[in-house]
Curated annotation (Swiss-Prot):
It holds the Pfam family PAS_9. FMN binds covalently to cysteine after exposure to blue light and is reversed in the dark. It comes from the Eukaryota. Transmembrane segments: none annotated. GO terms for molecular function: photoreceptor activity. Residues 26-97, 249-320 form the PAS domain. Keywords: Chromophore, Flavoprotein, FMN, Photoreceptor protein, Receptor, Repeat, Sensory transduction. Residues 98-153, 320-376 form the PAC domain. One of its GO terms (biological process) is response to blue light. This is Protein TWIN LOV 1. The modification S-4a-FMN cysteine is found at C296. Interacts with VTC2, VTC5 and BLH10.
Length: 399
């Protein structure tokens, strides 16, 4: 299995790792690397929900280098025999922002499959209750004890005396099954007799306890180093009154939209930005933590037309859409300004109340460029539609 970076990725590996260490301190990675566990940490606020940290134990277990893992989604370790039901359990847990523990068949870089106990939990920001990361611990399932038990129970099902990895489903009985660094030959009879009694590999109680202890150790490190940075995290959600909480499922859905846009909450004081797309960060030169919580006027400068700002304010107060051309300022090295073709539109909830405003930006220089697919105005309306669908279909977390 060879991993390659997607050409659509906005973030470099360094930027993806910075998005993680920015909440803590520069020493967080060194502290995490001292832990003996196999685990990864992902960031749902980055498009594609990529891995932003991988432990040395995880890299050794899978055979990949850190450069091959950082920036990738965890699904790249799955394969043709990975149980789809287990994957749906994990996705559902992410959507509901809760912990989950399942047995999972993953694949090493060499292509060999292995069973593991997958234990994932969310990490919440203590100030706003939003999910900041997901921690996933992977404990290899040995299966020895279960193997012996199964052999005794199903010994009369087949005359074949070759060793069978009884704790695993037939769907993975091919080639060599690697267990605890030892290759065990696995042979399966084509006869289906008795196979319905075979179960998916189940972790022992000690392996489940090991996963729980590992999660607690990782969380302890994250909490400690977040205290040093002043941006506290915790393993439980603490929502402050008046602070908007976007579910991670909504954040992931919004991350699939590749255009430049921001989402603001008109119900909060000063209508702050609560989501900024990767393309917006590229256009303006700002980092995500510099944008969230700001009012959109932070992009304005000395030469920004105040009458345009007033027009935008009036439309927002009336709950109406508007399209303007406004001079904005970037955070690039040259602090350059750019003409922004900005479309603002309300996003309503199921009851018809305005829940958010979406602002879609197109650099005006692109307006005169021949675009084969869609005109800028059409692209903006497409983004608005995609945001509305994401908001209405995602599970919203209410504080």
């Amino acid at each position: 299995m060879s991993l390659t970076k997607s050409s659509e990725s906005v973030f470099t590996e360094e930027e993806e790792e910075d998005s993680f260490s920015g909440r803590y301190t520069l020493w967080i990675k060194e502290a995490l690397e001292e832990l003996p566990h196999n685990f990864t940490i992902t960031d749902p606020f980055i498009s594609g929900h990529p891995i932003v940290f991988a432990s040395l134990g995880f890299l050794k277990m899978t055979g990949y280098s850190r450069e091959e893992v950082i920036g990738r989604n965890g699904k790249v370790f799955q394969g043709p025999k990975t149980n789809r039901r287990s994957i749906m359990e994990i996705r559902e847990a992410i959507r509901e922002e809760r912990s989950v523990q399942v047995s999972l068949l993953n694949y090493r870089k060499s292509g060999s499959p292995f069973w593991m106990l997958f234990h994932m939990c969310p990490v919440f920001g203590k100030d706003d209750g939003k999910v900041t990361n997901f921690v996933a611990v992977q404990v290899p399932i040995s299966g020895r004890e279960h193997h012996r038990k199964k052999l005794r129970n199903v010994g009369d099902l087949s005359s074949d005396t070759s060793p069978t990895f009884g704790s695993c489903r037939r769907e993975v009985c091919f080639g060599n099954f690697v267990c605890q660094d030892r290759a065990l030959p696995v042979e399966c009879d084509d006869d289906e007799q008795g196979l319905e009694d075979w179960e998916q590999c189940e972790a022992s109680e000690s392996e489940k306890l090991k996963a729980t202890e590992a999660i607690n150790n990782v969380l302890s490190i994250l909490v400690h180093y977040s205290e040093l940075s002043g941006r506290l995290v915790c393993g439980k959600r603490y929502c402050l009154r008046g602070v908007d909480c976007l579910s991670s499922s909504l954040v992931i859905s919004l991350g699939r939209i590749k255009q430049s846009f921001v989402l603001t909450n008109p119900c909060l004081p000063d209508m702050p930005i609560i989501y900024a797309s990767d393309a917006f960060l590229t256009l303006t030169g700002y980092k995500r933590q510099e944008v969230l919580g700001q009012n959109c006027r932070f992009l304005s400068g000395v030469d920004t037309d105040s009458s345009v700002l007033y027009e935008m304010k009036e439309c927002i107060l009336k709950g109406q859409s508007c399209t303007v051309q406004i001079l904005n300022y970037s955070n690039r090295k040259d602090k350059s300004s750019f003409w922004n073709l900005l479309h603002i539109s309300p996003v309503r909830n199921a009851s018809g109340k305005t829940a958010y405003f979406v602002g879609v930006q197109v650099e005006a220089s692109c307006r005169n460029t021949e675009i084969k697919e869609l005109r800028p105005e059409t692209r903006q309306l497409s983004v608005v539609g995609a945001v509305r669908v994401a908001v209405r279909s995602s599970l919203m977390v209410t504080c």
